[in-house]
């Protein structure tokens, strides 16, 4: 039996940038009785807290079975049930020079392609320490507007390719619904899975990963290419259904 269930966040556990539903919160609480849970996604730790932690009304024992990997696995947080607080295990921070070059490249390419927002809702380019993220409509745009902006991913891929040419020493990925994420090369969701394996002293066969962008080029694809068993989902309801099936089988 698998030991860890790992998940992307947006469109896997929740609507993009939204808190998990009551149904998902209840289901994850049940899952934590039998499995460790890892969540790996592009947002900051504060976003994880808003979308997941604050919605899970669980005890310290279950919290200690959560493994949170913000900014695509460039950071790793665990809950200390003695100190009753979250602790960062590592962070692969970008240098100031790397951040400046990425910021300039993102704005240059987005403007040249006509994708720089004139009326953004929230930050357009966000320094997340270990990652720089471009949000085409602004971080706080509504889910409806985000889903409508680039349904076939052509805009994001065009920005990604243009930025990658300007910063070849860094990793440029199409991230969430409207975002481009830039980190150090080789620091991706597969890197996060390896860190999880090392920390828990398990093998990749012990992990089952749920993601909505498992196709080649998607930001979940590195996990699949790494050799972890994966389940493809397209919305959080798919994930809940599969989790309920797993729980029914093992009980």
Predicted features and spans:
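Active-site phosphate-binding/coordination module
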Residues: 19-121
């Amino acid at each position: 039996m698998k030991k860890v269930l790992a998940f992307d966040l947006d469109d896997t556990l929740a609507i993009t940038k939204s808190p998990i539903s009551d149904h998902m919160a209840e289901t994850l609480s049940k899952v934590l009785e039998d499995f460790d849970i890892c969540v790996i996604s592009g947002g900051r730790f504060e976003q994880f807290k808003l979308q997941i932690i604050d919605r899970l009304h669980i005890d310290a024992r279950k919290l200690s079975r959560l493994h949170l990997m913000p900014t695509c696995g460039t950071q790793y947080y665990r809950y200390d049930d003695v100190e009753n607080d979250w602790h960062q295990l590592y962070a692969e921070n970008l240098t100031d020079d790397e951040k400046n070059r990425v910021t300039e490249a993102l704005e240059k390419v987005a403007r040249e392609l006509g994708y720089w927002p004139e009326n953004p809702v929230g930050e357009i380019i966000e320094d997340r320490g270990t990652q720089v993220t471009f949000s085409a409509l602004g971080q706080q745009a509504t889910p409806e507007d985000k889903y409508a902006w680039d349904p076939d991913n052509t805009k994001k891929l065009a920005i990604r390719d243009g930025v990658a040419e300007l910063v070849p020493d860094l990793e440029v990925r199409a991230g969430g619904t409207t975002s481009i994420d830039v980190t150090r090369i080789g620091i991706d969701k597969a890197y996060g899975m390896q860190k999880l394996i090392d920390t828990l002293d398990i093998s990749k066969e012990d992990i089952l990963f749920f993601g909505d962008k498992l196709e080649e080029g998607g930001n979940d694809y590195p996990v699949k290419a790494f050799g972890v068993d994966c389940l493809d989902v397209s919305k959080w309801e798919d994930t809940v259904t599969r989790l309920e099936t797993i729980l029914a089988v093992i009980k």
